[in-house]
Swiss-Prot record:
Name listed for the protein in its UniProt record: DDRGK domain-containing protein 1
Organism: Drosophila ananassae
Lineage: Eukaryota, Metazoa, Ecdysozoa, Arthropoda, Hexapoda
Subunit structure: Interacts with Atg9; the interaction is transient.
One GO cellular component term noted in the UniProt record for this chain: endoplasmic reticulum membrane
Function: Substrate adapter for ufmylation, the covalent attachment of the ubiquitin-like modifier UFM1 to substrate proteins. Required for ufmylation of Atg9; protects the nervous system during aging, possibly by stabilizing Atg9 and supporting its function.
Cytoplasmic topological intervals: 24-304
Lumenal side: 1-2
Entries under Pfam families matching the protein: DDRGK (PF09756)
Region (Disordered): 31-174
Length: 304
């Protein structure tokens, strides 16, 4: 019986303790509600919590940027012509903010805003680097063009000097040839006058010796003939042509500077040979000419 009483007392005490605990908790909750401000209808949660609105943040940001603008404007603008190219990158963002060169980003700025402005700054730096590289490339190309033009001018000047030297050399050569021609012509005229004024017998003897020298040697080197009779080579050629024209001698001057004398009898023999054969090739004529035309000098025939 005593055990049942003790269990009942314990249960009663436990119920009382639980009731007191619940009552105390309810009272503490009721006291805390008046301390908290009731939410206001129509007012944003950020304003109720004391957080500045986005418009206020933008105004504060613009104020700070305007304060930093004079400092950025004082820096030298090295790339002034490229200002028009950077207008798009320097425009204000969605709320009209402009990032001046060298401006320090606000620590309180939002992460998205900061990333956007950092991207614009990186793009501006990249644009300036590209502009610098382009200017360097243009300067290098201009230098190479100038060097190429200078080299072309040097080559053109060298070519002009070479052509001028060739022209002067040609004129000098033609002048000397003309002087030689005039001297030869004058000497020929003087010699002709001497023949006319000299003794007629002496002239005839000299001409006869000239003709006999050709007939005796058969093949005469024109330079040797001129030396033998104290004439110039051209004078000797002119005299031979005159003698051929009047029929005194017959023969041919080859391209090696020799006169080959052919007598009348030998010409008749060649003509007879051609007439007999009817048609004669050059090879046959050349082969037969060795027998028809005697090219051995008279002095050699006498000694043999």
């Amino acid at each position: 019986m005593d055990l049942i009483i003790l269990v009942g007392i314990a249960i009663a005490l436990l119920v009382v303790i639980i009731s007191l605990y619940l009552l105390q908790k309810k009272n503490s909750t009721t006291e805390a509600k008046p301390a908290a401000a009731a939410p206001q209808r129509g007012v944003p949660q950020r304003a109720q919590e004391g957080v500045p609105r986005r418009a206020q943040i933008a105004r504060n940001q613009r104020n700070r940027l305007r304060q930093n603008a004079p400092v950025a404007a004082a820096a030298p603008q090295a790339e002034a012509p490229a200002g028009s190219d950077n207008d798009d990158d320097a425009q204000a963002d969605g709320e009209g903010a402009r990032l001046p060169q060298g401006a320090v980003l606000d620590e309180k700025m939002g992460a998205k805003k900061r990333a956007k402005m950092e991207a614009k700054e990186a793009k501006r730096v990249q644009r300036e680097q590209e502009l610098y590289d382009r200017e360097q490339r243009k300067a290098k190309e201009a230098k190479e063009d100038a060097e190429r033009k200078q080299q072309e001018e040097i080559e053109a000047e060298a070519e002009r000097k070479k052509a001028e030297a060739e022209r002067l050399a040609k004129e000098e050569r033609e002048r000397k040839e003309h002087e030689e021609y005039l001297k030869m012509k004058a000497a020929f005229s003087v010699e002709e006058e001497g023949f006319e004024e000299g003794d007629a017998d002496e002239q005839d003897n000299l001409l006869a010796d000239f003709i006999q020298y050709i007939k005796d040697n058969k093949v005469v080197v024109l330079e040797d003939l001129a030396v033998a009779f104290k004439l110039k080579t051209q004078q000797a050629i002119d005299r031979i042509q005159e003698l051929q024209a009047d029929g005194t001698i017959t023969g041919v001057i080859d391209d090696r500077g020799k006169f080959i004398y052919v007598s009348e009898e030998e010409l008749v023999a060649v003509a007879k040979f051609i007439k007999q054969r009817g048609r004669v090739s050059i090879a046959d004529l050349a082969e037969s000419s060795n027998n028809l035309i005697n090219l051995t000098p008279v002095s050699a025939e006498g000694s043999s």
